């Protein structure tokens, strides 16, 4: 860089008499909106664009500081990349479909869906907000599916406004013209188009199979949505009997499933049961004949070592049933209750009577009946013993999952295809994880998949499958030959739209058609966010240009807890559809913990609403707290950190105002006139100023390297550490020289020395405004406006490069500033220990330090003497390494060997 290019020209404005962070958010947010500061231009090629796959928050959830935490991490990177010259594509989406939204709408309006009801265009809900109270299903008003969807859309629109207001106040540099809703027309079109292409390639398929089922939400649940929780229960030792009445005992926590038993299973290597393999026993109470079989998945050390296989009690039952080709004997309905009709396989009259007593009962009630009957029959050995077992729950549910057989849609994800599994592992190796140790979580998940991705849900508010089925002459749907629309018709709702070649009168009649009534899992849409925001496969030129310049995307920021759901499913979809990764980098944030180091959650009642700390401390302060946390690690909600962030923002304002006011103040210390300045590195001539610039060059280099590696907290630490040193040491050391103030002997600093200090101050604070801009967008914009009036936003300014500061340093060591700071610290210590004013003169002093320290201090002796008010003799004593060691003092320390204080200044009387 030439000398001319290194010069920073400043247009200085009048300065406010008082500075503070209050009011900055509203002031600058309005300017950013008016100027389109964060708008994506899309005028350049892919290499000049940085695109972010922003997480669309679930708007049905309540706002909490966890949102502020992770989204700040993303915004720091977005702002940094924009300052690096990239055209940043930073959209925002709203995840507004799925079960959480439905549950919120049910409670908010007091309604539930009854698909048999017609649409009522004049419907008014019985409630308009219930203060978070849950309304029992029996008290909810039944409405049509269409009425329910309208209420979902109405409430999510309200919720989205709250989220947007928070994001804007926090200062997220989002392009608000680039927003989407996962239930909107465009995302629906993308999701349906991708599904139809998956179907055409054989990657999507439907199957009647046993699957996990949530009895509360009445829907199938995918493996990725499971949550293993400890659940209390009882072990029951139950006798099955051979033909001659000899018992063989199993232990079960689910005796209510005895009627669904198909076999007894033991490990083939279990010597206790080898003799029985191939023999038959009869189930207690129901007298159903079942075989004793071998399977390697049977655990010899669990319970009695032999277990009953029912259809279905858990996923192990499914494995045994599939591997051993056992009969299907389901007795649990989708509502979680025992079937009403006694099954045909129970032939014993007494057994049929027992079953009739359990018909229609919940599993809990049925269990009690069966246990009582087992006691009466003598088939219960001893009393049930308490136990706690890990049980599968739907992550949003509060009852254990059942396994029921139903027709569902699946998407291949490597769970049943070894080749695809290996390909997805390789995709994970291509992806840059930040932090890198998160990669193993992805790989463990992919390796552990035991089935394809179940993508259908038996709910209402979501993206419909774009399918119909022919209805045969007997009125049965032909699920093997789905009717699909052409892509140009998308999006469609098959419950409203009619397939080509049919008319509405043929709906649900023999020889006509019927709609697919299931909807897609919300993750089936969210997994396509890169394709949604980049307008994949849209026919218009603008969309094609957008896709070309933004896909594959650069960054996916997200929480560590949804690697298995969102991150993996997005990789799967891009691999199947685009034959590439959806993005190059993934950043993973940790969780927010409360002050007791417990994860914040609504159920625990320890959630903090984010508006509170923003109102109290300011957006910059809250952003500072969030940005100080390292990726991948949990962080504590810490108002102490926010106070530090607020203090940092205020210090930036005060330090910048102080430096810019030098030489411009009137007698009342008011700066009312504009001015121009040229901060030329060649004008930095004094050793201390050069040392400050040398350290600044190091900081710029380290901060840049950290942000390039997505280590935002490391960059902040480096910048902040030097900022405080710059303010506390450097400014204090040079302020007298910068003002041209004579020393204690009346010596006036030269114009060259004055200019050197003022130039270094200008270069330094200009750099800090830009270095801190990604973290403190409001305070930095304010000080930038004082320095560079009319030049636009600091957030569109160039990120600092080392060249001007290297040029200004001209080979100086940054350690000179460190030594000078330590020397001043010792001079202050003399006065603080004597309990006198810092304005008290020092008549004489002798400081000792290592030889390199003495040289550094000597180079800045004039500034140090003025800062410490040394008016007399100032001696420096060089200590050798062995002396420091003998005195147990670090070689980097400065010590006072002797000093003499003058008289403290007389306090002026208060008027």
From Swiss-Prot:
Quaternary organization: Monomer.
Keywords of this entry: Aminoacyl-tRNA synthetase, ATP-binding, Cytoplasm, Ligase, Nucleotide-binding, Protein biosynthesis
Organism annotation: Bifidobacterium longum subsp. infantis (strain ATCC 15697 / DSM 20088 / JCM 1222 / NCTC 11817 / S12)
Motif ('HIGH' region): 57-67
Major location (coarse): cytoplasm
Protein name: Valine--tRNA ligase
Region (Disordered): 882-911
An individual GO BP term: valyl-tRNA aminoacylation
CDD domains membership: Anticodon_Ia_Val
Chain positions recorded as ATP binding sites: 602
Sequence motif 'KMSKS' region, residues: 599-603
Molecular functions per Gene Ontology: aminoacyl-tRNA deacylase activity; ATP binding; valine-tRNA ligase activity
Gene3D superfamilies per record: HUPs (3.40.50.620), Isoleucyl-tRNA Synthetase, Domain 1 (1.10.730.10), Valyl/Leucyl/Isoleucyl-tRNA synthetase, editing domain (3.90.740.10)
Stored PANTHER family: VALINE--TRNA LIGASE, CHLOROPLASTIC_MITOCHONDRIAL 2, VALYL-TRNA SYNTHETASES
NCBIfam families: alt_ValS (NF000540), PRK13208.1 (NF009687)
